């Protein structure tokens, strides 16, 4: 190291001496366009019937009307994107309601595209729609992969037909991106993007979400299709496979406990990268803030760390909290 890189010649505190200097030298910045807000829309609710989610303070289940109103309000505050999760009034073993053209997600998407300029993304999965709560078709107690692909393709196509800009398969079945891309292209939806939950771990941090949408599995767990939290090389293989199959955007989920994975995926692939700041990460921060152990500044810092790790887009329940801050 040369002499001019040593103290007292080199003084790093010069770079931090005022808010103005710190601001112009800041390496990582959050912008409202970085944020995607996940919204829960229930077919069982009517206009004005907004349900608080006990496991996720400050989050709600909305009717179609109220979801559109809330999304429009947040758009006025700077939000650019939403990710829609549906909750049907009836479930069955084959997730039939998930690809109903008049289903809750499909109706919400149509309204959002008519009444807002938001980028509308949709979650493509079976778990909220199956009576058993698994993300795939079950045959003799086994989650079967290839039979599930046809259902996923039908769901994604129904979302595209409703006007979704981006479909986001979250099931973790092998080959789902290729199947969905083929289905969309064959139907003339070549311009519909796929944001793949490429690297989705079998995480304990999903627990509040499963309570929010009543999607906990009725038997077993999801470890036969979601990834082992111990693995990182596998994450790179999953990401590459999804890119080869036609994914436009990759996603890592969860985010905060997997910042190293986000960094590795960012380093390897020069494609748009999303990260999901999941329900457990949200709820534990909310609980700590409510108890006085942390301040609201921890929200900004945690989301900033996801951006710094390499994510271009951040799906977060904190989006409304951040719109007035960043």
Swiss-Prot record:
InterPro entries: ALAD, ALAD_AS, Aldolase_TIM. One of its GO terms (biological process) is protoporphyrinogen IX biosynthetic process. The active site is at residues 200, 253. Its cofactor is Zn(2+). CDD domains: ALAD_PBGS (cd00384). GO terms for molecular function: porphobilinogen synthase activity; zinc ion binding. Belongs to the ALAD family. Catalyzes an early step in the biosynthesis of tetrapyrroles. Binds two molecules of 5-aminolevulinate per subunit, each at a distinct site, and catalyzes their condensation to form porphobilinogen. This is Delta-aminolevulinic acid dehydratase. It comes from Methanothermobacter thermautotrophicus (strain ATCC 29096 / DSM 1053 / JCM 10044 / NBRC 100330 / Delta H) (Methanobacterium thermoautotrophicum).
């Amino acid at each position: 190291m040369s002499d001019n890189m040593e103290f007292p010649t080199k003084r790093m505190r010069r770079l931090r001496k005022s808010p103005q200097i710190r601001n112009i030298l800041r390496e990582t910045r959050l912008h409202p366009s970085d944020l995607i807000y996940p919204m829960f829309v229930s077919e069982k609710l009517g206009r004005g019937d907004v349900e608080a989610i006990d496991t996720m303070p400050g989050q709600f289940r909305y009717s179609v009307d109220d979801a559109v109103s809330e999304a429009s309000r947040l758009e006025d505050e700077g939000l650019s994107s939403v990710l829609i999760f549906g909750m049907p009034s009836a479930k069955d073993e084959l997730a039939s309601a998930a690809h109903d053209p008049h289903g809750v997600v499909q109706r919400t998407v149509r309204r959002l595209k008519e009444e807002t300029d938001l980028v509308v993304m949709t979650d493509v999965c079976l778990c909220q729609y199956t009576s058993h709560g698994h993300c795939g078709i079950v045959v003799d107690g086994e989650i079967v992969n290839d039979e599930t692909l046809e259902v996923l393709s039908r769901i994604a196509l129904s979302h595209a037909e409703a006007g979704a800009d981006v479909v986001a398969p979250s099931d973790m079945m092998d080959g789902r991106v290729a199947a969905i891309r083929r289905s969309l292209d064959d139907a003339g939806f070549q311009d519909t993007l796929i944001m793949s939950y490429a690297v989705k771990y079998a995480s304990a941090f999903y627990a509040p979400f499963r309570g929010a949408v009543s999607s906990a599995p009725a038997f077993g767990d999801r470890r036969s299709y979601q990834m082992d939290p111990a693995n990182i090389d596998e994450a790179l293989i999953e990401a590459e496979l999804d890119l080869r199959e036609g994914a436009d955007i990759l996603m890592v989920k969860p985010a905060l406990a997997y910042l190293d994975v986000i960094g590795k995926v960012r380093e390897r692939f020069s494609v748009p990268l999303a990260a999901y700041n999941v329900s457990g990460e949200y709820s534990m921060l909310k609980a700590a803030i409510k108890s006085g152990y942390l301040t609201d500044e921890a929200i900004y810092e945690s989301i900033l760390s996801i951006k710094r790790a390499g994510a271009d887009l951040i799906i977060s329940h904190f989006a409304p909290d951040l719109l007035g801050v960043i």
